[in-house]
Amino acid sequence: MGSENFHNAKTAKNDEFYTQYPDIQKEINAYLEYDPNVFKDKTILLPCDDPEWSNFTKFFAQNFDNFGLKKLISTSYARASKLKKYGQMDLFEDTDYITKDPNYQSNIDAEKGKIFTLTRKNKKVDINDLKWEYLNGDGDFRSDEVKKLRDEADYIITNPPFSLFRCFISWLFETDKKFLIIGSMNAITYKEIFPLIKDNKLWLGNGFSNGNAYFAIPENIAKNYANGVYDEKTNLVKFRNCCWLTNLDHGRRHQPLQLMTRADNIKFNKKLKGKEYQKYDNYDAIEVPYTDAIPSDYDEVMGVPISFLNKFCPEQFEILGMESSAGYDKKIVGLDLLISGDARPSIKNKTTFARIFIRKIK
């Protein structure tokens, strides 16, 4: 259901979801626990963020002093397109935060993006010190003025529109910046994304609680989501197919999996039901259908589910490649295709789901 909802959102362009404050707090805490000074004297850019509505801006503004930030920059897209699609969704307590500000100009407000800034001064800084002004353009992250802000920043943190995710990743990697973004687990299989994971330039973050991500949405798009996905009491939608993607280090990433031997898995792992590990028809590797069934004593290539990346420890395994489609690309797959035809991993002529090929580091 989660994957289907991401697809529906992308197709309908209803792809602006507002991240919950506790989810942001939980994720950021994982990096602070690993390195308490991770944000000290740094500039953070929050693009695609709609500061009037965003918990990202609220969170970092409220914790500006706690984190020792140098500067916080948050940009929003022009109000006209947002109001047309979604209606108003203010998260700041004062709903007149913009319209009563001396900078407010009703004749250009709908067409111009905004930039919100908070800068280190010789006094305690809090959210009330947040200043804003209009951008020259509409605030699109691809514009030259937002690119300049990107180049100024040390960190880029946001929940980019799902429909522009590939474009955003390309924009992000035009520079060598630290980043933390939200995306679909499906994005891992994109040809623009997986090589970054393979080369250890991007990995999964700490993750959402119990694998569930909840986002605020406007009521007028709630009809797009099934019962059990949208909660009309909270105005939240739930996705299970959602993750944080980052190049910031965190402790869980370096926790090796506790694994059983091949023989013990066959004997005790209830998911395997006593079955031997099988080799693929078309790749020199064995099929491991569950992450917790990876054998500790197997040194050759294994195919594992995409969800393995939630537990991936780079000191324990190396990622060789991935196959998720019928087409074969040696640069992506990383293994030789032994039989011509459908390149998806197969066992006894039956294809599996997408698989990542890994090998234990000796």
Question: Language-model features: where?
Answer:
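Class I S-adenosyl-L-methionine-dependent methyltransferase catalytic core
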Residues: M1-K362
